[in-house]
């Protein structure tokens, strides 16, 4: 499998060939793999899990793993090792996944089931306080008066990591496009830490390991502040990040100036990748060495995009981090 020649240390043996889906490098970045599930695989999955509405997955968390098992069985056991090895591979850590035939908002429940299956083949999605579930669905429209940039369409949502303002391990983030109408622009923006031109400079700065305060606006429904540094390291000493510009609260002038320079450097990176994501497709990335954001939309009175996110921890094996994770 040529797509996996970059993986040095496997956590599970890889299959000789994928079954029920194909794998190819993304046109936008060789780090990003595209997994495309055959229509027959998708239809078989939808039929096999039809007995469980999404509410059943909400109420019985073990069913999230069962639907993952069903999808892996339909792929003859080839899917879980591919997902796990890719999400943990420092040279990759990112996938754009397309289930052929799931491409209309009327199939939203099946989209949620499919994404849940993939996520629970690598770990478990965390409780999302904003929605009160293990996932969150939200809508972007032409006008917005919310308290964060999440739903604001006419500006860039800057590069960030998820899970910065909660005391939860957030190894991965999954972002699904459920629907869109009258859309122009709004591509996903990604940046791998190892591609960021000034990563080493900021990682080695004294501020990199300083504990900072992170707060969330009321819409996030998180009452307590959390404290952690912007940078951390993995078990091999490589940089990881937990950063979002909107929610970090610098204590003083020095922290504020450093954070501003950090933000300018990330946004000015020429290594940012712009990725179009079709309806029904989703990104699944390692949250600790990929940053993500969103490009602006072209204004339109009928503009609408519905999204779903899941974020959680990798359960096989537990990734090791030096601090804070």
From Swiss-Prot:
This is Glutarate 2-hydroxylase. Fe cation binds at residues 160, 162, 292. HAMAP family: glutarate_hydroxylase. One of its GO terms (molecular function) is glutarate dioxygenase activity. It holds the Pfam family CsiD. Binds 1 Fe(2+) ion per subunit. Homotetramer. Belongs to the glutarate hydroxylase family. Signal peptide: none annotated. It comes from the Bacteria. Keywords: Dioxygenase, Iron, Metal-binding, Oxidoreductase. Its EC number is 1.14.11.64. NCBIfam families: PRK02963.1 (NF002814). It is an enzyme of class 1 (oxidoreductase). Its cofactor is Fe(2+). Acts as an alpha-ketoglutarate-dependent dioxygenase catalyzing hydroxylation of glutarate (GA) to L-2-hydroxyglutarate (L2HG). Functions in a L-lysine degradation pathway that proceeds via cadaverine, glutarate and L-2-hydroxyglutarate. The keyword tRNA-binding does not apply. GO terms for biological process: L-lysine catabolic process. It catalyses: glutarate + 2-oxoglutarate + O2 = (S)-2-hydroxyglutarate + succinate + CO2. Pathway: Amino-acid degradation.
């Amino acid at each position: 499998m040529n797509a996996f020649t970059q993986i040095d240390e496997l956590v599970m043996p890889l299959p000789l060939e994928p079954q029920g889906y194909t794998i190819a490098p993304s046109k936008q970045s060789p780090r990003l793999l595209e997994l495309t599930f055959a229509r027959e695989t998708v239809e078989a999955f939808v039929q096999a899990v039809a007995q469980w509405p999404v509410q059943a997955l909400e109420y019985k968390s073990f069913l999230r793993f069962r639907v993952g098992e069903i999808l892996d069985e339909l792929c003859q056991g080839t899917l879980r090792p591919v997902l796990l090895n890719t999400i943990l591979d420092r040279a990759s850590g990112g996938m754009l996944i397309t289930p052929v035939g799931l491409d209309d908002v009327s199939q939203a429940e099946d989209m949620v089931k499919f994404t849940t299956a993939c996520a629970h083949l690598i770990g478990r999605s965390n409780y999302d306080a904003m929605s009160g579930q293990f996932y969150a669905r939200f809508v972007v429209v032409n006008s917005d008066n919310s308290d964060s940039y999440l739903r604001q369409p006419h500006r860039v949502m800057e590069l960030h990591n998820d899970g910065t303002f909660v005391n939860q391990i957030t190894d991965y983030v999954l972002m699904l496009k459920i629907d869109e109408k009258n859309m122009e622009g709004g591509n996903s923006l990604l940046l791998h830490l190892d591609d960021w031109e000034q990563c080493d400079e900021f990682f080695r700065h004294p501020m990199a390991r300083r504990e900072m305060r992170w707060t969330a606006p009321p819409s996030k429904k998180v009452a307590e502040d959390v404290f952690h540094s912007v940078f951390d390291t993995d078990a091999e000493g490589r940089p990881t990040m937990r950063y979002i510009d909107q929610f970090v609260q610098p204590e003083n002038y020095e922290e504020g100036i450093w954070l501003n320079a950090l933000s300018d450097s990330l946004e000015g990176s020429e290594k940012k990748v712009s990725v179009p994501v079709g309806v029904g497709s989703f990104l699944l990335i390692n949250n600790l060495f990929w940053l993500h954001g969103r490009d602006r939309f072209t204004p339109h009175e009928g503009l609408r995009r519905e999204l779903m996110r899941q974020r959680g921890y990798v359960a096989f094996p537990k990734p090791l981090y030096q601090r804070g994770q």
